Amino acid sequence: MDAGVNHLISQLFFENKHFYIFQERCALAGIDVPIAAGIMPVINKRQVQKMASLCGVNVPKKFQKILEKYEDNPIAMRDAGIAYAVDQIVDLVTHGVDGVHLYTMNNSYIARKIYKATHSLFESTHKGAKDASNSA
């Protein structure tokens, strides 16, 4: 913070409650810069296992069931991973998140699908912020 940080990006997570706890801890520590939530849409079971191991990320039972159900169907797995990420983003925006960072691993298809499903949430939030600043 002393070096001039003006925003943060969280590591990935699959349960929003962990991000909300992180936000609270940052606030208690006096960190008052915007924090973007790090969301990684999962496209295969191996990817989840690797990231969970690497980052110490908890994989909730709800998500484990999705992984098991679609592990032999790559297209369905990709679509379920995108849907799960979109649900996370909707919840985050509803709770006033400062922003979202997508860890798409350079997969433009996933980025495009998530953008199409969520851009209106950000446009209405951004428009509301612009309207509020214009009326001040």
Description of each model-found segment:
Residues N16, D79-V86, M105-S108:
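Electropositive phosphate-/nucleotide-binding environments in soluble metabolic enzymes
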Residues I31-V33, G96-H101:
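A short pocket-lining beta-strand/turn micro-motif at the edge of beta-sheets
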